[in-house]
Structures are given as C-alpha cells and as structure tokens.
C-alpha cells in the first residue's frame, strides 16, 4: 500500500514502506509541521490567486501558520485554497489599493472571510474542511483593527 498525504502535504507512510529512506521523509514531514505551527510567508495576490499544496514538499504557502497578503490590487481580489485544507491561520492584509480581499475554498457555497476595501488588518481564521463540497471559513472576530477586552474572571491563581 502506498503512502497517503494530509491536506497540508505531510506524508503518512504505511508500515514497511520506505525502508532505508524513511529518515528523509520524516525530516520533510517535520519541516512541514514546523511551518504549520509557526511559519510566516508573504504571498503576492492579484485579482484571483489560487494557493495549493504539493504532497511531501516544504514551502507551500498554505502550510504556514501566518500568511501576509501583499501586492497592489487594481480590482477586488480572491484567494482560494483546496477543499481538504484544515488549518488555523493568522492572515494579514498587507495589500495596497482600495479593493476587497476574500479568502475562501476553491469551490462550494461555504462561508468565506473578507476584508473591506479599507480594512488592512489581521484576522484569525479557521479553515474547517468540514464538508466535502461546501466547507466553511470561520472568522474568529479577533482582528488587529478592533478593540478587545481580555476576560480573566475564570482564571484562578
């Protein structure tokens, strides 16, 4: 039985597979996991930008925890991701231009996350991969542009 891959590209080896070479595969998987936990990457966007993951490869934009979108928009822009990607992201809208930016799955009618034309803030977003054809994006509502209170009433010291 051959290896399978997660939505973010880590290789799941089957028992007995890759004899003598599993170290290389494991190192690549650990690098991908490191990116998922705390990696930062900048991604230039245009009108439509499709992000993808190559199985068993490091460096995919989507495998990073923090993504800063850059570039000068000349129209409303959309960034799409594959249906099977499930990840918590910190997304920064570092684009120039008074146009909207939307982050969504490549297809389906699930919910999306959008920045207004003048919103150049940061969002904490969960890509749920909760449905095979209509997955949802969950915007935590925590952003760099709003005021938030930290409630410590349930913490016992």
Show where each model-derived region lies:
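Extracellular disulfide-bonded cysteine-rich modules/repeats
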Residues: 25, 120-129, 154
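Glycine/proline-rich low-complexity spacer/linker segments in large multi-domain proteins
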Residues: 141-151
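Short, surface-exposed terminal/edge motifs of secreted or surface/virion proteins that either
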Residues: 30-39, 97-106, 111, 124-143
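Tight coil/turn sites that cap or link beta-strands
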Residues: 84-86, 118-122
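Exposed extracellular interaction/assembly regions and N-terminal maturation sites
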Residues: 1-101, 149-154
